[in-house]
Each structure stands twice: as structure tokens, then as C-alpha cells.
Amino acid sequence: MTDVVIRPITPDDDYDAQMDLSQRAFGIYSEQQAASWLHVARLRAGQGLFLGAFADGVPAGAAMLHDMRQYWLGQPVKLAGVASVKVAPEHRGRGIGRTLMTELLNIIAERGYPLSALYPATTPIYRSLGWELAGAKHKFWIPARSLRGLVEPDRAARGAGAGHQDVPVRRAGPADVAAVLRVIGESHRAARDAGPLTWDEGPAAQWLGRKDLYSYLAGDDGFAAYRWAGDDLWVERVHARSPETLRALWSVIASHSSTTDDVSGWTSPHDPFWWLTRERDATVTYRSMWMLRVVDAAAAIAARGFPPAVSASAPLEIQDQARPANSGHWQLAVADGKGTLTPNGGVPSPAALTLGPRGVAALYAGTPVATLRLAGLASGGTPDADAALDAAFAAAPYMVDDF
């Protein structure tokens, strides 16, 4: 049997061989995709975030991590994004993928990430190590003509003195990366969003520098980016904290209605976009689920945002074989928009909700306790504790980023 070695991929490794492995797993890359992959792969290798499996010195599998923050009720939490996980076709079925992911989970924990997320090509391997379905990307579609006239704000809701305000819109590029990240972050905090990501300035500037991306800043609180996808328009993201700014940005996108028939993009299920169009012809055409892993339960709870009006307390019992530090008897407390998870001295509570790592991930993401129990991801607890946990963790997680 061929010996398989798991080790970090270094800047001195053969990247042509790594590219070949990726294309055997995911298909042929375009010239732009290949250049982007190579740039990111070398960057992650330099950070020690690119892990490889080698059989007799030949690449047999690989995976990489992205350093990100994920917003939970408006609070950014450090997150390791797992990406580009693959095993060479001739080496599949030998446990290489599981060995690779086990070592990757150890690296994530050693680097101090409370959370990890990924888009699964298949779920069993990730579930076996504690990841669970948590949220989704939602693809919207709308006829471009339907964007020509946006619904005016409801005067009854605006109050006396509210009137139209023109918001200046200007082009944005890599030099504006700090302003763009500020606007995106402020937008997520104001909306108390759950699930969306933010990147460091380096990868964000690279994205803003794409030749096929058209991005705009509006006033001091808005940002939008879109690109052409064949004859259609693809909206990468739209952020705003005022109705005027939101309409100014969508008006830029709507100005293409004479040159395209269709507009699509990733969106949130509660994006204000759904309430802006005159007709109900915008629709979700595709939903892609992503998975979450709570790597450090206490740190993840401490970093997460919670509803400010909710006060709750509940005992939990966690069993996490892959991350034993999460295992034990805990007391969850939520108040004033913050949460704590503290050991209760090892004393079991007959009222405790019992969870494995998959149940912890799903609960963290706002899945109702009744759903967890019916899915076999939780047991025990009490009706009062269920209601308190549902109120504390209530969220509708989404992403708009690929990684």
C-alpha cells in the first residue's frame, strides 16, 4: 500500500501538479480562474493554510483555509473557511479525505478560530467531523425591465419632513478597499445580519481589482458591485443603510435594463430588495446550503451577537469527540446582546439539552430546538429552555460569497 504523508504545502511545491489535481477534481479552469487560483494558493501556502496529502511524493489530495470573519447578529466572529478540498480520483475511498480534514480541523483549532464553514460537495465526511448544515446562498432572478421603476418609500412610514435626497454615486476600485470594507461591515452590524463574511484588505482589494467587476460607492453608507455574465447582469452585492442610498445603487444597476433582459445574484432572504420592486416577479431560483463547525464552543458564544432584548439561561451537555475541550456540562447565559458558556463544575443537570457538535453548530445558526430534536441532533431539555434557546439563537443565516 502506498504511504500517504499529510503536510503543509509550501511556496516551493509543484503548483502545476496542484493545479492538475484541482482540475481533475473540479473541471478545467478558465485562464482567469487559473490565475486567481494560483495567486490564492501561493498566498495560503505562505500563511501555512494550504494542506496537502502526498502519495510517494505525488499530490493525492489537498485543502486550504481562508482567514475570514463571519457576522452573527451583527458581530464579526473569526472564521476559517475550508475550500478546495479534493482527493485524486485514483486515491479515493482510502480515507485520505477524512485524514486530511482531521488534520485541517486541528490546524483550525490551533490557529484560534472559534468557527469554521464550508460549501460541501458531499456532506457525510464533514458531518462525521462535526460540521452541519447551517445556512444558504440564495440566487435571485428578476427581469431587468422590472427594475426600471422602484417602489417609492411609504410616506406614512417616513413621517413629517421626510423628502427625496440625492445620493452621490462614484466608481470604486482597489484604492477604496478600506472604505468598501467599512461600508460592508457597518451594513451588516446595522442589520444584525447572520452568516455573511468579510475579508481582509488584501483579498478584498484583489476582488475589487477584477477587470470584469464594476463597483460603486454611494454617499458614505453604500456599496454595490456587479459584472456581466454573458448577456445577463450578475449582482455581486448591494449594501446600504438608508433608503435613499439603496435606491441610488439599484438605480445604477437598473440603468442596464435597456441592454440586458435578466438580472441575477446572491441575496439574503430578507434583503430589502424584495420590497423595492413594483411587481412580484423577482424569485429565488437556486439555494445552496453551507455547513458550520463550532470549533471552540465557549469562544464562539462569547463572540456571537444575541438579540439585545432577550435574557435566557439554559444548561447544556455537549459531547464532541473530535474537539474534547467542547465536551462537558455547561451553563449558557444570554443578556444585553451577549452570551457566555461556562462550565458548571461537571455536575449534570436533568434539564440539560444534550448535543453533539453537529447539534451545537445548527443551534448556533438558529435552528429551532424542536427541529434539532426531530432530526436526531438533540435530546433532553425542557419546553421552557427550548423557548429560551430559540429566542436567544434566532437567526436566518445566509452568505453571498464563494470561497
Residue ranges and their predicted role:
Residues 1-67, 73-81, 147-201, 231-234:
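Short amphipathic alpha-helix that is part of the acyltransferase structural core
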Residues 119, 132-150, 155:
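Conserved catalytic-core motifs of GNAT/GCN5-like acyltransferases
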Residues 110-114, 120-139, 270-285:
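Conserved active-site alpha-helix within GNAT-family acetyltransferase domains
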Residues 2, 11, 157-403:
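Intrinsically disordered, low-complexity, positively biased terminal segments
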Residues 122-125, 131, 146-147, 174-177:
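Short acidic/polar capping segments at secondary-structure boundaries
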Residues 84-87, 93-106, 110, 243-254:
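Conserved acetyl-CoA-binding loop-helix of GNAT-fold acetyltransferases
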